[in-house]
Amino acid sequence: MYRFARFDEPLLNKLPQKKVEIDVYHSSIPDKLRRKHPPNIPNLEEQQVVRHFFRLSQMNYGIENGMYPLGSCTMKYNPKICEDIASWREFTDIHPYQGESTVQGTLEMLYELEAMLKEITGMDAFSFQPAAGAHGEFLGMLLVRAYHEFNGDPDRKEVIIPDTAHGTNPASAKMAGFDVIEIPSNNEGTVDLEALRKTLSDKTAALMLTNPNTLGIFETDILEIEKMVHDAGALLYYDGANLNAILGKARPGDMGFDIVHLNLHKTFATPHGGGGPGAGPVGVKEDLEKFLPVPRIKKDGKRYVLDYDKPYSIGKIRDFYGNIEVCIKAYVYLLMMGKSLKEVAEISVLNSNYMKEKLKRSGFYELPYKDLRKHEFVVSCEKLLREKGIRALDVAKRLLDYGMHPPTIYFPLIVKEALMIEPTETETKEDIDAYVDALISIAKEDPEVVRSAPSKTPVKRVDEASAAKNPVLTWKDI
């Protein structure tokens, strides 16, 4: 049984401190600007600070510890060579205000990365400004708005979103000023074509779609969906959250999508969240290129230049040019993978279906909707809840006692007591087998043990609702 490292580690401001008098006198500092008291920050030795954060790191869990199967998050292992190259001084020491002639290498890298992403997705142009996936969605919705306004159709204020869409889609559309209309899935877990047909109108601006969707099911009617959307005068938006499943196998542009956002911090092996920052580049078809944020990188002979002369651009959505170091990591990853990129899709889909089948055959976890899945799948703990009073939340918490990170839970909302699992292509058969064995073992355990979990972690079961409602944002509040 796995046991987490556990330290009784206080906050930095609670560690033993030296009281040091600070001489703030200097003749050039006016009296009214001089400190009367030392700053209210911890006064610690370097060794204390290093040990503090090292201990905290040992109580954390990351992809280096083990499998991290958060559904729709693609928590694959990130090759460390990408981190190494992105940390070169040639990249870290440049400044966005430098002249173009002094950053030709970086501009060339971004130009080539754009060409790679265009080839992978079937788009005609990309912007790297968005700092994350949801930021990319927001840009995509602004592009939709600009497109319809440019074409004299500003009354298109509705964005259609399936109930299996990625979770941030409704918020992004709403922030861009659209009304969100949700349509249901059919009994196979894909878009209900009749519901879509009834919802499309001259008010429809776009349909936002993830393909495969968050159930891990490929939308096999995508070409019919594309025709219906475009016949209605609307645009088709692709959320790239699940692109990992179709890399080198299918392209959103060939399916008829007009706008795509990608997650470099997911599909192209750059760190997520606290290991970030992220990057959510947005690609478009040719007739939308003129609306992309400025500047755009173009090649002028042998030189690369930043082009601000885009009168129809929506402007900027972020300072400078985006999270360039994240782009560097993705660029290195793509160079490493080369033509083997399609194996990412093949192995991720294979791992997902292997794991899904083992869980389904266990008899403890139910698989709603059709059987064949892509890179991820969703099982339900509803049977465990009926028979033993064990919820998906309980299973997730108990997995922590096995030294394993839980999957996404309670999403998508159309599956009751959902466990959303994405093993990714970087996990071995042995890793997957061990995770399945843990899930089966939990299903067989005493319900009270599962409901009281975790018992072996440094922090026990927390009140997530209270934490969200009453955040403590600074150590001064503790």
Regions found by a protein language model. Give the residues of each.
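Acidic/polar loop patches that form or flank catalytic/metal-binding clefts of enzymes
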Residues: 126-127, 181, 207-208, 237-238, ...
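Conserved phosphate/anionic-ligand binding catalytic regions in large, soluble enzymes, centered on
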Residues: 61-82, 129-137, 268-283, 287-288, ...
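Short amphipathic alpha-helical face segments that pack within enzyme cores
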Residues: 112, 138-139, 143, 325, ...
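Non-catalytic terminal extensions of PLP-dependent enzymes
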Residues: 1-124, 149, 300-317, 321, ...
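Short glycine-centered, acidic/aromatic-flanked micro-motifs in structured strand/loop junctions
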Residues: 130, 185, 209-212, 379-381, ...
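Conserved PLP-enzyme active-site core in the AAT-like
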Residues: 104-108, 135-301, 389-390, 417
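A short, small-residue-rich loop immediately preceding and capping a beta-strand
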Residues: 124-130, 158-161
